[in-house]
Curated annotation (Swiss-Prot):
GO terms for biological process: D-alanine biosynthetic process. This is Alanine racemase. It comes from Psychrobacter sp. (strain PRwf-1). Keywords: Isomerase, Pyridoxal phosphate. The gene is alr. Belongs to the alanine racemase family. One of its GO terms (molecular function) is pyridoxal phosphate binding. Its EC number is 5.1.1.1.
Amino acid sequence: MRSASIILDSKALTHNLNCVIDTVPDTTKVLAMVKADAYGHGIAHCLPALKDADGLGVACFTEAQHIRELGWDKILVLIEGVFSETEWQQSIEAQCQSIIHHQDQVQWALNHLPPENSPCRTVWLKLNTGMNRLGFESDELGDVAQSLVDAGYELILTSHFANADAPNHPSNAKQIDTFTQALQQLREQVDPSIKASLCNSAGILNFKACHFDWVRPGIMLYGSSPVEGVSAQMLKLKPVMSFKASLMAIHNIAAGTSVGYGSRFVANRPIVKGIVSIGYGDGYPRVVDGSAWVSVQLAGEHSSYKCPVIGRVAMDMIAIDLTDVPNPKVGSQVMLWGDPELGAPSVDEIAESAHTLGYELLCRVTQRPLREVL
């Protein structure tokens, strides 16, 4: 059987959630982001490990429905809001809270007021503070908030950082200032009980004065670093996903021999070449550069060997340089990414080789690899 597989460490997920809980004040609640099938990890596998979160955030109502079917009965927030008036009504039936970021959504909320004891009586009002993607502008926020409060809604003011991963970026201070001023005005002029949520993963770590009432951790829950130039290990985060395969063939090749599509790699010396049963059809990135590497584990040995990826990544296979591995064997385990403390490259390292982010690699893992939950 083809050996490509994903190992999901539920204890690591719980550990990372506890890191968030320990970082924020006791009065701050945690909305764990599980959009895109828990960042590619599989929400059904992750849900038990996230039981101590105060709520979950998803991108859309379809994701929320699935999570309700899995038995989650706590707060569930639609981060993109609803896309129609009908969906607003459906979200009330499913007891989902929603972000409101444009005037049509306001009108749907006014047209269909949830029951008085429904969690949907709380809405998340989105302010555009500088991300310039979604949300109301500061000068229209007051009227929107007043109409919702008058109708019987409780509000959580929310926004999103554009550059929280780079703490010294000048936009961060501007966004924080815009947000705090808007929050103060709403509390003074509309409702003093309005709550607030600003921080994503990077914000939680970099802007501790801005934790407010809710934080929204995402990528840090899954053990990938949200902060530019700081590794997940340095942040005491543990990788939840490990990606592994095995050696399926080994060949000796002479200097001057090319490997793979496009003959991009040409050996400059005699090398031992290994073929690994993994490719972009499994979610390994096709566009890795010459810095990408894997970890090869030989049977009966505790140490592992760092081996460069050579040639182009194909749909089902990659080639690696095994020259420095003593007596490699077909069937030996190959770690594509995982726990650096166990000798594997981190997902962030491979993402850097592919000129992207760990977020994307985790979300792009396909259904072909087998799943194993620890």
